[in-house]
């Protein structure tokens, strides 16, 4: 029984974080998109599942899979436009974990800031008035500017360290 890395992505952020994590996994560890997940997921002790945050939780494709995971160890990693150390980031992992059939199977979670699709920014600015939580403001513009460079090399290094520490914890 081994480990598999699954990821759902929209802009490529989560895919690139998954690939960084895969580079420190034991040789032969599968790393595939959620839509290509093998039917025999129960054959794996540990599932690393990556998703992009949508409305404060895992995106729909990943959420559907999370609801079915009964593996012994589940590890989440997520990308979002907000800062990785924000309350929103932490709460996104918590909300995704609430979807698990067995909440005790969640080992840990990692969050990385990622660039935001410009179409999403445009849509948000049209939907929400300036100054509102999701509307245009100097703070929101600064957040989007900061997100443009992520994930970056430091994020990938952090993702690799996270993956190594989780594997060590599970083996120890």
Q: Which role fits each region the language model picked out?
A:
Residues 37-43:
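Short amphipathic alpha-helix with an adjacent loop that forms part of the alpha/beta core around
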Residues 2-24:
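N-terminal beta1-alpha1 ligand-phosphate binding loop
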Residues 3-5, 40, 158:
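A general marker of short, structured functional hotspots
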Residues 24-32, 44-49, 54-172:
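FMN-binding flavodoxin-like domain, especially the glycine-rich phosphate-binding loop
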Residues 1-2, 106:
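A structure-centric signal for secondary-structure junctions around beta-strands
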């Amino acid at each position: 029984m081994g480990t598999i890395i699954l990821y759902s992505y929209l802009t490529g952020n989560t895919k690139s974080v998954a690939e960084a994590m895969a580079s420190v996994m034991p040789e032969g560890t599968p790393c595939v998109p959620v839509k290509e997940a093998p039917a025999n997921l129960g054959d794996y002790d540990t599932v690393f599942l990556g998703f992009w945050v949508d409305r404060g939780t895992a995106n729909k494709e990943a959420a559907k899979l999370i609801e079915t995971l009964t593996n012994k160890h589940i590890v989440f990693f997520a990308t979002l436009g907000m800062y990785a150390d924000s309350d929103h980031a932490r709460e996104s992992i918590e909300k995704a974990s609430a979807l698990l059939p067995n909440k005790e199977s969640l080992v840990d979670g990692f969050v990385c800031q990622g660039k935001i699709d410009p179409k999403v920014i445009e849509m948000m600015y049209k939907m929400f008035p300036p100054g509102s939580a999701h509307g245009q403001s100097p703070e929101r513009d600064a957040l989007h500017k900061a997100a443009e460079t992520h994930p970056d090399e430091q994020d990938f290094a952090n993702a690799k360290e996270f993956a190594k520490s989780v594997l060590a914890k599970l083996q120890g």
